[in-house]
Design a protein with these regions (language model features):
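Proline- and Ser/Thr-rich low-complexity, intrinsically disordered segments
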Residues: 1-175
Length: 175
């Protein structure tokens, strides 16, 4: 100043905490991301921290501006989080389909190349073989059987509905 005095001060410039984001799968169907192969009942969310709060979100695909994304199928979803100062952080998450539920039905009884031992008999059987989906499975046969093998069958057509742990179903029949 005019008297020759000098004043000194120091200023510390501090960075805000680094903005981070972590997307995660929030749907859980017995360990699967979506209930059935091809279903769109999955969900995901993103957690943001650091930066300057007042976050906005943008998901692709989908264009959602929420921190959660619902009614989605298998695939990779990317989210960009923007804080109040315009800083960004991106993360992604991948939802996977469970194996497709499949069913085959076959005659399992064999009496010298015949399905039933005698004309008019009821000692035939049929087996439902299931793969994919999410175990355990339930069986509902048209004759009332509720196991993988329907027994005591007479000649005719029998149908079965198999349901997995997530409610996915497949139908089959045998004559």
């Amino acid at each position: 100043d005019a008297l020759g005095c000098i004043a000194t001060t120091s200023v510390t410039v501090v960075n805000p905490p680094q903005l981070t984001s972590a997307a995660s799968i929030t749907s859980d169907y017995n360990g699967q991301d979506v209930s059935c192969f091809g279903s769109t009942d999955g969900s995901t969310s993103v957690a943001a921290s650091g930066g300057t709060p007042g976050y906005t979100y943008f998901w692709t695909p989908g264009g959602s501006s929420n921190s959660t994304l619902s009614t989605i199928g298998a695939g990779t979803y990317n989210v960009t989080v923007t804080d109040l100062n315009g800083c960004t952080s991106s993360s992604s998450v991948t939802l996977v389909n469970p194996p497709s539920l499949s069913l085959s039905v076959a005659i399992s009884s064999n009496y010298n190349s015949q399905n039933i031992s005698c004309f008019g008999g009821n000692d035939g059987s049929a087996t439902a073989t299931v793969s994919g989906g999410t175990a355990p499975y339930t069986y509902s046969w048209s004759n009332g059987a509720t196991t993988q093998i329907a027994s005591n069958l007479s000649a005719g057509t029998y149908s079965v509905v198999v349901t997995d742990a997530n409610g996915c179903t497949r139908n089959g029949s045998i004559t």
